[in-house]
């Protein structure tokens, strides 16, 4: 996603906070001030008034940024005002500075996001030049990475299988000069990735491990994304209502690819590795079963108490592989548990971390970039809940308590050498909000991007 080049003729959009409205009205031409007062413009989020000249041409737009309380309750509020503007070129006029200005600039780009792959015709949209004072390249990299994440999640599973997910990673690598290796089907067993193979073997589309590498200097950062392109639940079949959104079960993979774009586009000084176990959890005669005991890459055995807890299985092999290189940090993203949604809802990305510095930095960064996260604990006392006795680990502890925590504890068993952070994301916007239409959405990636320079001492 790109800003309009500055050589285009543009209409000013004057974005006003509600608390500065009266002062601004006193500086406007009397006709414009009278018009704003007569039409009830208050500067609330979503308020918009168009000003035309005597010939009927649009010459100025006033857009509300809301009250302080409204801004706390609604991110990217400027997008609500600009989304309905006539097609054409615009530039922003505002007193916003710093992080607030960056958020507004990102809102201008994300307001133009549309997933129109399956529509006969697209729509002409308003476009903005980069606001003065922002890092244009950074905002564009973030918006483009977020758009990639959304596109991948929104694509239905019939067009987004393990192969298509691998192709998306390859295309991203070609853009940035990265390298990709893909291990497919029976080769997963040869490479000692048995859990990935087992979860995906029942599907007609073969499972894969996608391994992207970029960068030759700096700290080693490995991102691991759950790539379950569709989750039927396996033999523990999901009810229809629970299966309806399961095209988004590769939201973790989509998130790490979007974040990888941001990192590479900004040329961050890291040695980046992205690992994505890409599988479909299907039902067939060779599907894995409840009661099976499976072997993992790490050598730990796992008793299967629910085939619908498959995400942690494929992540386990990928995490074990990542840990063998002893990177400076491993971060996983996964649409892993319903318990996380019950705990914090769809907007917030809960995370777990063994690294206090990163955890503290991440919490601060999330507020700076309007990407809310919340830390949950690796609570050691719950370790016994994932130990069934007959095997080393249980993939689905009974009882229903602390589901997000027990899933994170399960994953932590496969990372011993490296500091580890895990995000349990939802990856879906259930209803439209400014700059976030209903559908796939990235969570936690922008916060992590903001935190990385301090956390990795870049």
Regions found by a protein language model. Give the residues of each.
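Short amphipathic alpha-helical segment within the helicase RecA-like ATPase core
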Residues: 1-227
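A generic structural signal for tightly packed, nonpolar segments enriched in small/aliphatic residues
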Residues: 166-458
